[in-house]
């Protein structure tokens, strides 16, 4: 019985925490879909296609592949060249 009460309180706490820490829980989906539709009509408008601030091949990146323009990082940004 005690375990059940603890589980119920934990679930309620986590659910409340999720809504409290959300950026915009009221109009989040309402504003999300028009933006997505706009990006489908105009792929150039997508922020995912922009790689501002990425590092070129040969630049030190540590172990974070998101820093490289080519998305391949093994201490330095790597670009694979197709020979065929």
Swiss-Prot record:
Residues 1-22 form the signal peptide. The modification 4-hydroxyproline is found at residue 65. Keywords: Amidation, Cleavage on pair of basic residues, Disulfide bond, Hydroxylation, Ion channel impairing toxin, Knottin, Neurotoxin, Presynaptic neurotoxin, Secreted, Signal, Toxin, Voltage-gated sodium channel impairing toxin. It comes from the Eukaryota. Disulfide bonds join 54-69, 61-73, 68-77. The modification Serine amide is found at residue 83. GO terms for cellular component: extracellular region; host cell presynaptic membrane. PROSITE patterns: DELTA_CONOTOXIN (PS60005). Expressed by the venom duct. One of its GO terms (molecular function) is toxin activity. InterPro entries: Conotoxin (IPR004214), Conotoxin_d-typ_CS (IPR012322), Conotoxin_omega-typ_CS (IPR012321). It is found in: Secreted. Residues 23-49 form a propeptide. Delta-conotoxins bind to site 6 of voltage-gated sodium channels (Nav) and inhibit the inactivation process. Belongs to the conotoxin O1 superfamily. The presence of a 'disulfide through disulfide knot' structurally defines this protein as a knottin. The cysteine framework is VI/VII (C-C-CC-C-C). This is Delta-conotoxin-like MVIA. It comes from Conus magus.
